[in-house]
Amino acid sequence: MRRPHTLLAALLLAAGTAAAQDYGQAATLKIWDNTTAPHSNGIATPEREPEPNRIVDVSQAVLYIFPADPAKATGQAVVICPGGGYVKLCIDYEGYDMAKWFAANGITAAVLKYRMPNGHPEVPLEDVEQALRIMMGLEAGATGFTAGKVGIVGSSAGGHLAASASTLAETKPAFSILFYPVITAEKGKGHQGSFNALLGGSRNAESD
């Protein structure tokens, strides 16, 4: 088992810290932004928080790390994807509140502030896959958790992202926990706003 404090030290060395909100996390790791990621979401306006813990116009992917309680550490970790209809992130009750619960129960949690798709569905998917790679220690210089012990958690639109990572990404989580996920695009059953924000003008019957 690779210990959480070893992971944090290695990640901080490899990725550096990013100035960010204080949610009680032990470390804040910048993954990339629109200039360094494989794809851009095309959002040029600065990130905003129009109401507490509701973040919009996200163009920089960041991980907030909550280490497991050492007395209860299981050697497992999760990447948490908050929801928000792919237009904002509800980062409290679908993010760091969950992370604190997992950490208190021996599971290191990393809340992912992923970039909004803005009609570019590949953007949040590449963010979550990179987050998984970091937590698994697959990036140069990082010592992560055993790949078979890194899972993913997602709520609402974040549940859609978690499900996408579990089925479409090259680097897949070992397990998935989905809370009220947006799964179907069928009219009258799925949240249409999430799919409109995810796919933008490219949405059609085939993409649904």
Question: Model-predicted segments: where are they?
Answer:
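Hydrophobic h-region of N-terminal signal peptides that target proteins for export
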Residues: 11-19
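Alpha/beta-hydrolase superfamily serine-hydrolase fold, recognizing
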Residues: 21-208
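A ubiquitous, low-specificity "background" feature that marks scattered single residues
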Residues: 9-11, 133
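Bacterial N-terminal signal peptides that target proteins for export
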Residues: 1-8
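Alpha-helical structural signal
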Residues: 8-9, 195
